[in-house]
């Protein structure tokens, strides 16, 4: 700190004596052009330390001065005042017992606390030459000593070149900056090493032996700096991405035997099979050799298309294959004919459609009384007559499965004398 004038031999008066002093100071409260400046020593203030608010450019013929906490010049914010005549010091409501005022108007605050940070106002008055009081303001920020940081990791045991890891510097500290070190060197930013916006979190993408550490983080503010203990990631051996081979991706429902094989083969891995994201349950229908690398399904249904995955595991964890989905061939099922009306009147339009569940989609054809009419799912005959009565059949065929099926219905057409078809319906 700079040189100080020794504190005067003073009379110490409580804030209640302020009223008399205020009357004295206000007597000389006239305009002035003098410029008072205030600076802090040290310039960066930390908790528990001392700070001196050092005043420069004091006017001549000083009558006295008043210090306030904040920028409001009122009794509530009044810390202390000094009257040159009589070297009188008066303490106000904002005085904490840690402030020392000097004859050069400087204010020493000892053992600074959080509550001390902020703005201070100095009001100075002159006497006798027609000048008036002058006000100076100063604000300081309190910095805490940085704590010793520690590094937390999303995963201390990542798979080599496979898994991402985030390292976070704890604790989160206000008014502080974060620095990272790897192998004792300032951290280089690459595509595999990225920092969060506030630099508190470090992201590592695809950790290798060259980026496993050790890592250190540092918390720094204007008054202190602290560095963490080193943290090194423990790389686990890289697992190969498994894949599935299969003897038939287009099996026929309830006919073809399927064999799934999980590659690559290794005695060091355990194999697990998954169906629709669930571990494949033990079932009489599912056969697995002892090593479990091969999965055999004696038959498959349309509800077992998958996806299928296999997983290889070592003692540290596992990795799954890409999913494989089967194209199960089935059908055609027994077709259905819509609508199911069987009675019509002459002059009405006949419109029938046929549907059968099938993969791939079935081929459709229509016959009337055993005589081929047309191919397709829909049959339309405008203004039917009694001659259109007979047995209507829809035949379906799946060329992939080699299966066929058919459905028939009897249609009766009444003579023109009636109106509207009968209400009775014959469900198929």
Swiss-Prot record:
Give start-end ranges for motif Cell attachment site.
Answer: 127-129
The main place the protein resides is: secreted
User: What residue stretches are annotated with the Ig-like V-type domain?
Assistant: 35-144
Residues annotated as glycosylated: 104, 111, 268, 303
Originating gene = PSG3
Task: Write out the GO cellular component annotations.
Answer: extracellular region
Q: Which family does it belong to?
A: Belongs to the immunoglobulin superfamily. CEA family.
Q: List the disulfide bonds.
A: 169-217, 262-310, 354-394
Biological process terms from the Gene Ontology for this record are: defense response; female pregnancy
InterPro entries reported for this sequence: CEA_cell_adhesion, Ig-like_dom, Ig-like_dom_sf, Ig-like_fold, Ig_sub, Ig_sub2, Ig_V-set
Transmembrane stretches, by residue range? Answer: none
Listed name of the protein: Pregnancy-specific beta-1-glycoprotein 3
PANTHER family the record matches: CARCINOEMBRYONIC ANTIGEN-RELATED CELL ADHESION MOLECULE 19, PREGNANCY-SPECIFIC BETA-1-GLYCOPROTEIN 3
Signal peptide, first to last residue:
1-34
> What Pfam families has UniProt attached to this entry?
Ig_2, Ig_3, V-set
Q: Does the keyword NADP apply?
A: no
* Chain ranges of the Ig-like C2-type domain: 147-234, 240-327, 335-410
Give the UniProt subcellular location, in the record's own words: Secreted
């Amino acid at each position: 700190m700079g040189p100080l004038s020794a504190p005067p031999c003073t009379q110490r008066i409580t804030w209640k004596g302020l009223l008399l002093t205020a009357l004295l100071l206000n007597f000389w409260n006239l305009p002035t052009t003098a410029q008072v400046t205030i600076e802090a020593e040290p310039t960066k203030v930390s908790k528990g330390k001392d700070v001196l608010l050092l005043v420069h450019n004091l006017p001549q013929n000083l009558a006295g001065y008043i210090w306030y906490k904040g920028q409001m010049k009122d009794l509530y914010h009044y810390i202390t005042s000094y009257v040159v005549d009589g070297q009188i010091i008066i303490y106000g409501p904002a005085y904490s017992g840690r402030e020392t005022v000097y004859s050069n108007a400087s204010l020493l605050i000892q053992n600074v606390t959080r509550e001390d940070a902020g703005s201070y106002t100095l009001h100075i008055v002159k006497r006798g030459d027609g000048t008036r009081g002058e006000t100076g303001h100063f604000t300081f920020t309190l910095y805490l000593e940085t704590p010793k940081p520690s590094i937390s990791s999303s995963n201390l045991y990542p798979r080599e070149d496979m898994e991402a890891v985030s390292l976070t510097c704890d604790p989160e500290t206000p008014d502080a900056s974060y620095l990272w070190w790897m192998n004792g060197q300032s951290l280089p930013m690459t595509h595999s090493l990225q920092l969060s916006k506030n630099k508190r979190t470090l992201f590592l993408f695809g950790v290798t032996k060259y980026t496993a550490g050790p890592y250190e983080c540092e918390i720094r503010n204007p008054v202190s700096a602290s560095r963490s203990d080193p943290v090194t990631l423990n790389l686990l051996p890289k697992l190969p991405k498994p894949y599935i081979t299969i003897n038939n991706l287009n099996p026929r429902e309830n006919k073809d035997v399927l064999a799934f094989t999980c590659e690559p083969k290794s005695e060091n891995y355990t194999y697990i099979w998954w169906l629709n994201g669930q571990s494949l349950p033990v079932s009489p229908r599912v056969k697995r050799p002892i090593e479990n690398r091969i999965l055999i399904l004696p038959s498959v249904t349309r509800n077992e298309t998958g996806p299928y995955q296999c997983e290889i595991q070592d003692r540290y964890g596992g990795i799954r294959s890409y999913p494989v989905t089967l194209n199960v061939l089935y059908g055609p099922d027994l077709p259905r004919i819509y609508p199911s009306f069987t009675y019509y009147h002459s002059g009405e339009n006949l419109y029938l459609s046929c549907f059968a569940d099938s993969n791939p989609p079935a081929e459709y054809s229509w016959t009337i009384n055993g005589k081929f009419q047309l191919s397709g799912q829909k049959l339309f005959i405008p203004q039917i007559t009694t001659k259109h009565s007979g047995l209507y059949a829809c035949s379906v065929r799946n060329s992939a499965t080699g299966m066929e099926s058919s459905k028939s219905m009897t249609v009766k057409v009444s003579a023109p004398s009636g109106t509207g078809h009968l209400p009775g319906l014959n469900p198929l």
